[in-house]
Structure formats: C-alpha cells, structure tokens
Curated annotation (Swiss-Prot):
Pfam families: YbeY (PF02130). Belongs to the endoribonuclease YbeY family. GO terms for cellular component: cytoplasm. The gene is ybeY. Single strand-specific metallo-endoribonuclease involved in late-stage 70S ribosome quality control and in maturation of the 3' terminus of the 16S rRNA. Zn(2+) binds at residues 100, 104, 110. This is Endoribonuclease YbeY. InterPro entries: MetalPrtase_cat_dom_sf_prd, YbeY, YbeY_CS. GO terms for molecular function: metalloendopeptidase activity; RNA endonuclease activity; zinc ion binding.
Amino acid sequence: MLEIDNQTPLESDFLLLEKIANVLAPTQIIELVLVSDETMREINRDLRGCDYATDVLSFPLEAIPHTPLGSVVINAPLAQTNALKLGHSLENEIALLFIHGVLHLLGYDHEKDKGEQRQKESELIKAFNLPLSLIERAQD
C-alpha cells in the first residue's frame, strides 16, 4: 500500500506508483513524500551531512515493528526538470525515482552490491515500460 504526502503543488496520477509498491512490497506500507528543492536540501543536509538537493532519498523503518517499510522522499521540482531534460513524462521520472528508493528500503545498495539493484531496477523498468534507470543514467 502507498501513502502519499505531497508537499508540493505538483499534481500527478499516482496509480503507477501504487502498482509498483504492490509488486515490490505487497504486504507493507510505503510512504512517498514529495518535497521542494529547498526541503530536500535541508533533509539531505540534516540527515546525511550533504548540503545540496538530491533527487531521491530513502529512510527505512525496519527496526520498528508494525510501522511502514519506510519513506521515499522525492524532490518534485528536480524530477520535473530531469523529465524535461531527458524527454519523458514527469510520471515516468517519479516512477523511476520511486523504484530506486523502494529498492533501497528493501536493502539493495548499488554502491555496495554486485549489480543486484541495477538488475532489479532493469526488470521493473521493463515490466512497467519505463525509460533508463537512475543507475544506468549515472553510468552513461
């Protein structure tokens, strides 16, 4: 199940994200938070010590029983900019970010694993007919 906290003026159909959440974590709640560029910068600075805005952050809650799987925080203005730059829809960009974030909630880590997150992202991207993943874009 997907719970959405949209803190931006962005209007979008989140049906695709609900489908993705049901595939990746069918019995768990995932919180999606859409924030401004400045809010993302504050979160990144305060929680990770990185004083810049990023596109997506994930915060798992696995240590706390009977809570959501975690939160995926997406920088909506940056997603919109990237969608325009890359020539695909905002919904597709948010879906890519959401997949990336949820995989982190599930324990995948592209900086440490041996391609497992990239492989899983690729499978989901094909299944949902989405453009290139974040990991693939970063390597190009």
